[in-house]
């Protein structure tokens, strides 16, 4: 099938003759065909930026590519030929054909065709109070190659050949629109709206709901690891975590006082079981009207500075604290946010209101309250929960999409356009503010992610999953795929978050010997995950809850 441009207008557009413009100084060329401007830019010898922009549209600045990247080709030449226009680097040949109006990417050294466009189309729509394009780009893949990445999903898919996936954020689903091939190239699809990917007999297709243009990066490498290295060069390198982040994280939903939390740490030390981090989950702020007040409840979490100093000085353990993007109506920060007009008026499952993190004023207010109420008390690491952001029914992709879109426009545009990047903005806010305070390395755990988020010192986990063997198995493919998108730090709730719920295989929890064996296997798997962490609800996760010295499960957890 030839590359075609489909337009659904009420007006008729005259097709322009194909013409080309080349600029070797800027390492790019542009061609104009069928009212589309196609721009091909050489960022380095293995990273090529492709934009296809309809007449009258203007693309927006990328949120994922670094604004001041140091990318530069060692060699780039642009030339016309009988077939069209070619761009040569030391590693690649990028060709535009005037016959089918498609771009192909070839390994210049071996002469092997790596990837070829097949078709693209644009459909005019009115979405989110603006006139936008639905966009579609189809690529031709070779029969033998496998493709990975795209994020973390719960279907148990490893290789996306012949598969369809919805790139939508949800409680247990994480989006990163970066695809990587066993033929040592990747495609970074630079769009933040609802996106679908499908590979079938017609080709490999990216489709997005809201766009001004088709915008993607072709990223090659000498091997798959080098492809990811080039992805990091484009979107940001991964900062080094503090050494403690690579130790064991003890967590559960939840410790109800500093006394309980400190007793758990003391018991780990008494039993001489290694522990580097203790985690305080939600409701340290008190009841629901005080949701995420960004300060400690004075009844059960009194004298926080002294309590945290004790964890540091006496037990040599670090504290991670859960913070959310929404606030209860009885909190000071809610009143400040409401007065500034930076809260979304969309109902949530716990009655809080979510802030518009895209608004600089919201980010300023959030940090000012967090710094005074929590950071200055000595908290070491930050668990940013529900950063999809969570409204209601957040475990279901379509419901999460619906609630987000109905929340109204964001500061920078419609939620339809910026559907998937809430967590990227949250992470940027936290990381940049933390780095301005001191020279300590940053650790942020967040439930959602997007391309480029790795540059903000974040790890991710797979959400509120259920205790079943098939769910456990699906975490392996989900974790491997998200890590192959260049986000290397990922983990799960050891033993699953929900153990006694209706969908669990182990409704008796700890009373079921089968669950204790199940937990052991998952705990062992987490020991070899990038982040070694236990967490969940209903069933406590301290090692001694599963047996005593001499018991097979207890001893297995320690070995």
Predicted features along the sequence, with ranges:
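N-terminal accessory segment at the very beginning of proteins
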Residues: 3, 17-235, 239-244, 251-253, ...
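Enrichment for repetitive, rod-forming helical segments
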Residues: 9-11, 143, 454
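N-terminal small/glycine-rich loop or linker at the start of catalytic domains
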Residues: 239-251, 345-354
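Aromatic- and carboxylate-enriched substrate-binding clefts and catalytic-loop regions
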Residues: 62, 274-558
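Sec-dependent N-terminal signal peptides
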Residues: 4-14
């Amino acid at each position: 099938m030839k590359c075609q441009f489909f337009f659904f207008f009420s007006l008729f557009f005259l097709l322009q003759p194909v013409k080309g413009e080349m600029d070797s100084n800027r390492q790019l060329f542009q061609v104009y065909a069928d009212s589309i401007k196609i721009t091909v830019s050489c960022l380095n010898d293995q990273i090529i930026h492709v934009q296809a922009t309809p007449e009258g549209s203007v693309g927006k600045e990328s949120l994922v590519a670094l604004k001041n990247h140091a990318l530069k080709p060692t060699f780039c030449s642009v030339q016309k030929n009988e077939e069209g226009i070619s761009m040569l680097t030391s590693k690649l040949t990028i060709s535009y054909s005037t016959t089918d109006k498609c771009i192909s990417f070839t390994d210049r050294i071996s002469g092997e065709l790596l990837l070829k466009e097949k078709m693209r189309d644009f459909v005019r729509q009115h979405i989110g109070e603006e006139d936008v394009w639905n966009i579609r780009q189809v690529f031709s893949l070779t029969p033998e190659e496998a493709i990975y990445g795209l994020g973390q999903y719960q279907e148990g898919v490893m290789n996306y050949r012949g598969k369809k996936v919805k790139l939508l954020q949800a409680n247990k689903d994480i989006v990163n629109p970066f695809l990587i091939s066993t033929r040592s190239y990747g495609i970074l699809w630079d769009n933040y709206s609802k996106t679908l990917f499908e590979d079938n007999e017609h080709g490999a297709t990216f489709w997005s709901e809201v766009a001004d243009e088709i915008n993607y990066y072709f990223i090659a490498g000498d091997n798959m690891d080098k492809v990811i290295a080039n992805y990091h060069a484009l979107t940001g390198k991964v900062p080094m975590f503090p050494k403690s982040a690579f130790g064991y994280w003890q967590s559960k939903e939840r410790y109800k006082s500093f006394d309980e939390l400190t007793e758990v740490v003391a018991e780990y030390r008494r039993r001489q079981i290694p522990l580097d981090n203790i985690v305080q989950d939600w409701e340290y702020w008190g009841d629901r009207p005080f949701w995420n007040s960004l300060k400690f409840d004075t009844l059960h979490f009194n004298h926080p500075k002294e309590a945290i100093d004790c964890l540091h000085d006496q037990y040599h353990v670090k504290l991670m604290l859960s913070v959310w993007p929404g606030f209860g109506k009885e909190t000071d920060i809610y009143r400040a946010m409401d007065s500034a007009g930076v809260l979304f008026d969309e109902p949530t499952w716990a009655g809080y209101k979510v802030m518009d993190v895209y608004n600089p004023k919201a980010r300023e207010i959030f940090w000012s309250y967090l710094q005074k109420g929590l950071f200055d008390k000595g908290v070491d690491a930050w668990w940013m929960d529900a950063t999809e952001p969570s409204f209601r029914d957040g475990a279901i992709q379509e419901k999460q999409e619906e609630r987000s879109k109905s929340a109204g426009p964001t500061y920078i545009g419609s939620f339809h356009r910026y559907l998937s990047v809430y967590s990227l903005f949250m992470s940027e806010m936290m990381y940049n503010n933390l780095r301005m305070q001191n020279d300590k390395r940053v650790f942020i755990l967040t439930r959602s992610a997007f391309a480029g988020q790795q540059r903000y010192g974040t790890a991710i986990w797979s959400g509120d999953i259920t205790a079943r063997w098939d769910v456990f198995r699906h975490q392996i493919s989900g974790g491997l795929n998200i890590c192959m998108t260049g986000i290397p730090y990922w983990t799960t709730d050891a033993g699953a978050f929900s153990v006694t719920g209706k969908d669990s295989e182990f409704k008796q929890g700890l009373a079921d010997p089968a669950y204790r064996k199940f937990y052991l296997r998952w705990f062992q798997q987490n020991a070899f995950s990038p982040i070694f962490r236990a967490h969940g609800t209903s069933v406590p996760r301290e090692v001694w809850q599963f047996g005593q010295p001499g018991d097979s499960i207890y001893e297995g957890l320690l070995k």
